[in-house]
Design a protein with these regions (language model features):
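Non-catalytic interaction/Regulatory regions outside core domains
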Residues: 1-130
Length: 130
């Protein structure tokens, strides 16, 4: 099995553009297992309400859960985490050794967005990488 990477940019760009096409999406990025942003894009015209370093603080909890596999055998693997705040909702989706970080408008209907994004990310993982 090939390691899932975002080095093949055409796949990332395709998925990123698709995710950013949702009206409620503000930002999409990929965080590695060290908590560093590997790549990310804001929707055109969006003014960030937080610096990338502030998003990293939100990732601490998500990374901790992602790295803890203790409950996988009984509860199953982690599908995603949603953190809702007054000004933004943050969706964290584990994809192999990475976390996809997505911020949305706070009033977004999260479940339909997540289902579409999960399908998009599943499609991208099925593509054979060299």
């Amino acid at each position: 099995m090939s390691k899932f990477t975002f080095e093949n940019m055409s796949y990332w760009e395709s998925s990123s553009k698709y995710i950013l096409s949702f009206p409620e999406i503000r930002f999409v990025g990929v965080v590695n297992n060290m908590g560093n942003l590997v790549i990310g894009d804001y929707k055109k015209g969006i003014i960030p309400i937080a610096e990338i370093d502030q998003y990293k603080m939100c990732m601490e909890h998500a990374l901790e859960l992602f790295m803890k596999k203790d409950l996988d055998s009984t509860l199953g693997p982690l599908d995603y985490i949603v953190s809702k705040r007054k000004n933004v909702a943050i969706i964290t989706i584990p994809v192999r050794d990475y976390l996809v970080l997505i911020s949305t408008e706070p009033d977004a209907k999260i479940e339909p967005i997540i289902e579409e994004i999960l399908q998009s990310l599943n499609d991208i993982q099925q593509v054979k990488r060299i």
